[in-house]
C-alpha cells in the first residue's frame, strides 16, 4: 500500500485526481475515492452491458439499478441481469432488429453507436439524436470473447475464428473515443475499479476517470488485435508484442532509475531443484 501523500503525488502528476483525501489504497488502484474534484462530473443514467466474463458484474448492475439507470443488454448478459430480478431492455427492442447470423451481429446498429458516440455539447448531434429517436448511452461495459485462451486450448480454426469479437471491440473503441461523454469499462479487470468510482462519486464520474478508463480500453483493443494478427501471420517477419502487468523492480539499470519486468520470468529458466 502507498501512503496518502505518495498516492496523491502520483495521481496528481498523472492528472487523474485533485484534492483527494485518502488514508491508504491498494497500489494498483489509481482512482480518487473522494468526490472533490476540479472537473465536471457526469452522472450515469443509462448503460449498455455486453460481457463474456460476468464475475463481479452483479454489484455493478445492482448499483446502477439503485441509482435508477436504464440498462440495455443482449444475449447471455441480458439473461444474467434478468435473473438478478433487475429490469433490462433488450438491444433488439431499441434497434428493431433481432440478433442475426448466429449471434455475429447484435449491437452493430446506428441506434446503439449513435447513443455512444454523440457529443452532448454539439447541437447537431443533439438534434439528430432526437430526430432518429436514439437513446443516450452514458456507460458501456464490455468483456471480449477469450480469443487467446481459445487459441491456447488447441481449438480448431473454425472455433478460433468464432472467438474474434466484432461487436465488443467496436463498442470499446466507440466509447473510448467519446470519453468526454461516455464511460467505458473494457474488461473484467476493471469491474472493481469502476464500482469504486461510482460508489465514491454517487453514481458520477469525472473526465479524468473517463480518460483513464479510455486508455485502458485502447490497451485492451490493441492487445486483442495484436493476438489476432499473430495467429493469422504465418509469412511476414513481423511479431507484435503486447504485455501487461509489468512487475516493478527495486531499481533500473542504475539505482536512480525505475525498472520493470514484463513477461513470465519462470518461463526463461529451467528449474533444477
Task: Please name every model-derived segment.
Residues 38-91:
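N-terminal glycine-/serine-/threonine-rich phosphate-binding loop
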Residues 163-164, 182-246:
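Internal gly/pro-rich beta-alpha loop/helix module
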Residues 236-273:
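Long, structured protein-protein interaction/assembly regions in large complexes
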Amino acid at each position: 500500500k502507498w501512503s496518502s501523500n505518495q498516492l496523491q503525488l502520483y495521481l496528481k502528476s498523472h492528472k487523474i485526481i485533485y484534492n483527494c483525501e485518502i488514508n491508504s489504497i491498494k497500489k494498483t488502484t489509481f482512482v480518487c475515492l473522494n468526490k472533490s474534484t476540479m472537473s465536471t462530473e457526469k452522472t450515469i443514467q443509462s448503460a449498455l452491458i455486453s460481457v463474456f466474463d460476468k464475475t463481479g458484474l452483479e454489484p455493478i448492475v445492482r448499483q446502477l439499478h439503485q441509482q435508477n439507470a436504464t440498462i440495455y443488454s443482449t444475449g447471455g448478459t441480458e439473461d444474467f441481469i434478468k435473473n438478478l430480478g433487475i429490469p433490462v431492455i433488450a438491444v433488439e427492442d431499441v434497434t428493431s432488429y433481432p440478433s442475426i447470423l448466429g449471434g455475429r451481429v447484435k449491437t452493430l446498429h446506428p441506434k446503439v453507436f449513435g447513443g455512444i458516440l454523440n457529443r452532448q455539447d454539439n447541437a447537431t448531434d443533439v438534434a439528430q439524436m432526437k430526430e432518429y429517436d436514439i437513446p443516450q448511452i452514458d456507460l458501456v461495459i464490455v468483456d471480449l470473447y477469450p480469443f487467446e485462451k481459445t487459441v491456447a486450448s488447441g481449438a480448431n480454426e473454425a472455433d478460433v475464428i468464432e472467438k474474434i469479437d466484432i461487436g465488443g471491440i467496436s463498442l470499446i473503441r466507440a466509447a473510448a473515443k467519446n470519453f468526454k461523454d461516455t464511460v467505458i469499462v473494457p474488461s473484467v479487470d476493471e469491474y472493481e475499479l469502476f464500482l469504486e468510482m461510482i460508489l465514491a462519486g454517487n453514481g458520477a464520474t469525472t473526465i479524468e476517470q473517463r480518460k483513464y478508463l479510455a486508455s485502458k480500453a485502447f490497451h485492451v483493443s490493441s492487445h486483442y488485435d495484436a493476438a489476432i494478427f499473430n495467429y493469422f501471420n504465418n509469412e511476414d517477419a513481423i511479431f507484435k508484442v503486447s504485455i501487461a502487468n509489468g512487475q516493478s523492480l527495486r531499481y533500473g539499470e542504475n539505482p536512480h532509475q525505475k525498472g520493470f519486468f514484463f513477461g513470465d520470468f519462470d518461463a526463461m529458466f529451467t528449474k533444477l531443484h
